[in-house]
Curated annotation (Swiss-Prot):
Positions that bind [4Fe-4S] cluster 1: 64, 67, 70, 113
Source organism of the structure: Vesicomyosocius okutanii subsp. Calyptogena okutanii (strain HA)
Keywords: 4Fe-4S, Cell inner membrane, Cell membrane, Iron, Iron-sulfur, Membrane, Metal-binding, NAD, Quinone, Repeat, Translocase, Ubiquinone
Required cofactor(s): [4Fe-4S] cluster
Name listed for the protein in its UniProt record: NADH-quinone oxidoreductase subunit I
Length: 163
């Protein structure tokens, strides 16, 4: 009987409504944690794995030696490499494609590369106009690498103490 009376009093006084309004009022005056994304950026870890890039040596030559270790270690089979022997006896890639829809951004390709040719940059805001746009060709990868070489070197330097 007393439980029913307590329940009736709580329902009559709208106790749950007051509790909810109290929580709402408290959150109204608290500091906002939302970031207005395109205008504001949050800090990114130096170990963040984003868009891929192929690097070049300072003399302009591609670093990739077509060893295909990155292709072999990729758990998602997102990397496709075709290579050809050059006149000087070295092997170079003729095709280096990464399907970003398949890629799980695990970083195994970067770890497997013996010459630091493939890296994952800190670029995370990119879009594709079509399904074909998700395939990063060798030319696009080299372009990303050339445009971001200074940032890549800086993040490699910051990350070196953890390896």
């Amino acid at each position: 009987m007393i439980k029913k009376l307590n329940k009736l009093i709580k329902n009559f006084t709208l106790n749950e409504l007051r509790t909810g309004l109290k929580v709402t009022a408290k959150e109204l005056v608290n500091k906002k944690i939302t970031v207005q994304f395109p205008e504001e950026r949050t800090p990114i870890s130096p170990r963040f794995r984003g868009l891929h890039a192929l690097r070049r040596y300072p003399n302009g030559e591609e670093r990739c030696i077509a060893c295909k270790l990155c292709e072999a270690v990729c758990p998602a089979n997102a990397i496709t490499i075709e290579s050809k022997m050059r006149d000087d006896g070295t092997r170079r890639t003729t095709q280096y494609d990464i399907d970003l829809f398949k890629c799980i951004f695990c970083g195994f390709c970067e770890e497997a590369c013996p010459v630091d040719a493939i890296v994952e940059t800190q670029i995370f805001d990119y879009v594709f106009e079509s399904r074909q746009g998700s395939i990063m060709t060798k030319e696009r990868l080299l372009e990303v690498g050339s445009q971001n070489e200074q940032v890549i070197n800086q993040t490699k330097f910051e990350d070196a103490k953890y390896k």
